[in-house]
Amino acid sequence: MTYQENFKKWLDFAELPDYLRKELEGMDEKTKEDAFYTNLEFGTAGMRGLIGAGTNRINIYVVRQATEGLARLIEEKGDEFKKRGVAIAYDSRHFSPEFAFESAAVLAKHGIKSYVFESLRPTPELSFAVRHLGTFAGIMITASHNPAPFNGYKVYGEDGGQMPPHDADALTDYIRAIENPFAIEVADVEAEKASGLIEVIGDAIDAEYLKEVKDVNINQKLIDEYGKDMKIVYTPLHGTGEMLARRALAQAGFDSVQVVEAQAVADPDFSTVKSPNPESQAAFALAEELGRKVGADVLVATDPDADRVGVEVLQKDGSYLNLSGNQIGAIMAKY
């Protein structure tokens, strides 16, 4: 289909939500072409794109299509896999909670169990939940460190990591085979919460995850000796890291942790940074300001879904050195 035909198909869909219809009606020709000339591609790491109306955007219909593909893959594997189900988490971006529960609603229509976090959680905790709960897969609604207009949809395998190639290829084939995402049926979320097919999770998984985080400390004796004196400034850059990072650091024995409070608020617009990328020194501006104020030894930042970390260390001249990912990796390997 041409982009004009795709656009008309969307515009003619009677049940299209008002906010999407309004967006369609305000599109110029160039935007129409970009939004409808292709489908948002689902790859091995999932998909991400601009939020909005269109086949080349991320929205409830594109999310439904991806989840419908996953549901068909699970159905093919049988009832045991439907009972094991899918763990679902989401970050602080626009529409992240809606996309998460939209995914659960599609799965529920197929009789597939889902476990959805009650509020935003980091990607590493989603991976943990997949293994802890024994689910077949995990869905993470996030666009990682992309700018605010983006969101995304990642699928994880039963080990909490990237799906193995045979499952990933099958999932992609199922998604591509769906010709009309408007025809995908969804269950009533509140009704399925009551039935137990959609289970909301939170504190109990947090506690188990934090316990495992504590248990993987390599040298607790070293932390006990020096951790209380090390001054750390942490910023979650308006993302999910705020949910657990303070608690993880405190339970490990780091007693002097200051958080950049202006960036501890979940903000889908990431208002205090140009881009929420912790590998960019520009994202550390407020952390450096607080660091100089409190005399911090180390500055730490995480991206919106808290699976990417940036670090700066205090220099003798009082400035902060921004470490590259390679430098951080080398330091960790040596340690």
Predicted feature locations:
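Alpha-helix capping and helix-loop boundary segments enriched in small/acidic/polar residues
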Residues: 57-58, 90-98, 114-121, 158-166, ...
